[in-house]
Amino acid sequence: MLRDWQRDCAMRALTKYQGEQSHFFCQATPGAGKTILAAEIAKRLLASNLIDLVLCFSPTLSVADSIKRTFSKTLHCTFNGGLGSIGQSLTYQSIQFLNDEFWRLLTKYRVFVVFDEIHHCSGSEMEGANAWGQQILSKVQGLATYTLALSGTPWRSDSLPIVMAEYSDPDGQLLVDYQYSLKQAIEDRVCRSPKIVLVDNEHLTITGSKEVQSFSSILELLKQTKTSYQSIIHNDEAMEYLLGLGCNKLASIRLESPNAGGLVVAASVQHAKKIQKILVTQFHQSAAIGT
């Protein structure tokens, strides 16, 4: 069953496509159900005989696999690009490895292309676009009959424009066709109101050959020394100490909120596995890795 916002957004997307406009940008808060929305739009386009095939692109293999399962379930068919399949779910990275025959074959069909987490791809023109943005601009954009861009966090730390996005002016606000905010999601009970407690190391020391330097926070350490952020987060003692602080804080919070959980943002999957091992073996916590 669709949520109200998904039903509303799908209807607006179909209306725009049927009005001979080919692109739709949906910004919805993380966890709201954007993949199910995209699959529903694809289902309606197929039912209306407006498309023949569906292609989905996303940042990681795990996300691409999740999209494949959702589309296969919603469309009641295989979604692996094989014989008899209605489409395929791929990563942005894989675009550059698809041969010319693949693209020539697609020109014979009406294709609906879904770009998940589109903010990972930057550039309004080939010049200045990042690698993924260039692939979209050069190979995908002109091929698609209809495109759907999805993002939970539609901004970039480098301030570059998001590929296929429209802005009010060169330095202006991103224009989207549909927005489902965290505030709306909380009101609809789609998401819970986040209550976040941050943990920082309030007493860091660096021991050199001649002196011992102390700092009141990680930020102060980074500003006043040549120490890199990477060297801190991969340091075994630092990791164990901060994870210990976090576990103690979580234990105190759970006295009032038994369902509270802890979140550790890792630098990579390998880093996450190392953190998970410390949490399980040294702090006796249950821990799962998500990407």
Regions found by a protein language model. Give the residues of each.
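Conserved pre-motif I regulatory segment
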Residues: M1-Q27
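Walker A/P-loop NTP-binding motif
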Residues: M11-Q18, A32-N49
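Interdomain helical connector at the RecA1-RecA2 junction of SF1/SF2 helicase-like NTPases
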Residues: S159-A260
